[in-house]
């Protein structure tokens, strides 16, 4: 199926609908028949009504039209949305390569250009620890979007991945805007996992600024949302960060318990990337005490 008419016919027959049912409130049956036979194209408002009659989104229609195969752009966005931590450098590099291939054919695609730049910025921050150069790489994105009266879903997807590259004040401002926008999209997209990640990552800034009590506040919010909605991976990451904060606050035994719990849960879930990320973060924040902590993901814990 490579055209609109054949795809409409395939969907209609698959749903056991008559042509009259398919075109209800959209156009006459005779005109609908011409669309299925690829003789005319429907106007956008009538096409939308036909899709409503099919209980189908435009995105799904295009997916079916391509024989249930994602387009190169959709594949990039799928991989981009699955990135959990900035430490997944192999995945970041792979998606950058796919962006480069796509942009050779579609050089004016602003969104994919933003995705590519955001991933390059993340790599500079993660591998080279060069936040200045990373900010230079992505600054144009925020410069453009900061002037927008509304942030849309693709804007959210990019900004949630790069806000940590900016200076603290700018980063916190970006997160606040993203949280507001996420609430608007909660009935259309799965926003809670993103909200959890934003709170956990903003806590990182606060830890670096030694604002431990405020960091703990956002971490507790993350843990609550994660537990209520069964986001176990995000739960692990938030619990680990809670342990770090408690340790910084002088509650060393309690902090160790939470860090040990995060490591153990990640191990049980067989999430090796998350386990490695948690270890790296503990080592980064508590490097001087790492031997004294004697953490081990194999240690049994009381959940």
Residue ranges and their predicted role:
Residues 97-104, 139-146, 179-187, 219-231, ...:
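Amphipathic alpha-helical segments of tetratricopeptide repeats
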Residues 45-60:
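DNA major-groove recognition helix of helix-turn-helix/homeodomain DNA-binding modules
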Residues 1-14:
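A short, Lys/Arg-rich alpha-helix, primarily the initiator
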Residues 120-121, 158-162, 202, 242:
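Structural register within alpha-helical repeat arrays
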Residues 85-100, 128-139, 168-180, 209-220, ...:
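Helix-turn-helix repeat elements of alpha-solenoid scaffolds
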